[in-house]
Every structure is written in structure tokens, then in C-alpha cells.
Curated annotation (Swiss-Prot):
InterPro entries, A to Z: Conotoxin
Signal peptide bounds: 1-22
TM region(s), chain numbering: none
A GO-annotated cellular component: extracellular region
Keyword annotations from UniProtKB, A to Z: Acetylcholine receptor inhibiting toxin, Disulfide bond, Neurotoxin, Postsynaptic neurotoxin, Secreted, Signal, Toxin
Name by which UniProt lists this protein: O-conotoxin GeXXXIA
Lineage of the organism: Eukaryota, Metazoa, Spiralia, Lophotrochozoa, Mollusca
Subunit details: Homodimer; disulfide-linked.
Propeptide: 23-33
Length: 74
């Protein structure tokens, strides 16, 4: 019985700590830049490459296919 009470109190305490942290971050007091959203879509700022152009990932190409052998958009 005592162990159950201790576990319940511990869980409630940890939940309260999580909620307090969430409220602090939602007020815009971010400590890390990675937690903040830039508000812009990366895809809108980037131009897609045409067929035969150099690519490193499928997302670089218009048709979403980057040939790994030649590193060129197809």
C-alpha cells in the first residue's frame, strides 16, 4: 500500500514537472534555436533541378528520382 502511494505521488510529481516545462516553452522562452520553428517552408525556398543536373537526394529533383550511380536527376 505504501509503495503504491509513493509510486502515484512520484508519477504526479513528474507529470507536473513536464507540464511546467511545456508552459515555459510555449511562452516563447526557448533556450535552444532548434526548438523554434522558422515559420517558412523549406520546399518553397528551394528550386528543383531538371533532368541531368547534379543531385544528392531525390528531393533535389523535379521528378523525385536521383540516380545514385551518376548522381544526376532523371
Amino acid at each position: 500500500m505504501k509503495l503504491t502511494c509513493v509510486l502515484i505521488i512520484t508519477v504526479l510529481f513528474l507529470t507536473a514537472c513536464q507540464l511546467t516545462t511545456a508552459v515555459t516553452y510555449s511562452r516563447g522562452e526557448h533556450k535552444h534555436r532548434a526548438l523554434m520553428s522558422t515559420g517558412t517552408n523549406y520546399r518553397l525556398l528551394k528550386t528543383c533541378r531538371g533532368s541531368g543536373r547534379y543531385c544528392r537526394s531525390p528531393y533535389d529533383c523535379r521528378r523525385r528520382y536521383c540516380r545514385r550511380i551518376s548522381d544526376a536527376c532523371v
